[in-house]
Amino acid sequence: GFGRLGSHFWGFEMSGVIPDIITLGKSIGNGHPLSVVITKKNIADVFNNGMEYFNSFGGNPVSCEIGQAVLGVIKEEKLQENASSVGNYLLDGLKNIQNKYNIIGDVRGRGLFIGIELIEDMDNLVPAVDEAEIVVNAMKDKGILISLDGPDHNVLKIKPPLVFNKKNADYFLESFEAVLLKSF
């Protein structure tokens, strides 16, 4: 969400559906503890039955202003467009690296949400679980935090901040290729 995919502000928009209820957390507050529930009026009206919901921080004007400010920065600084252009640049760079290293079975993603699937054997698509852990730790040693995902924990998950730029992408690509060259 929040434009990370570049092409869409919300991930569900890619599927052409509108959910009945949407929950937001963490990113909307940019470090400030804030979460949001968004729903359709007919669903919200069901809760208007005389029972009062109370929360000490519900509707806090400071929190609401922070959420509005975060959305404003995303729009004003064109961070969704940045996610698209820098994400495409990073994806292209990763696909070029994929052509050099058999351990990379697939590179996929959209915007600044990218996965790199590591495999031991291209013919049998055996997940490279131990190797994925090695890459995550080696990237951490270079000051880059990525994580593992997928049912076999062999997919490197790359979700940099929305302000990630081409210079950051170049550093990531150089570091990633150096790790692969040294480790495999």
Kindly label every feature range from the protein language model.
Residues 1-184:
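Conserved N-terminal phosphate-binding loop of PLP-dependent enzymes in the Aspartate aminotransferase
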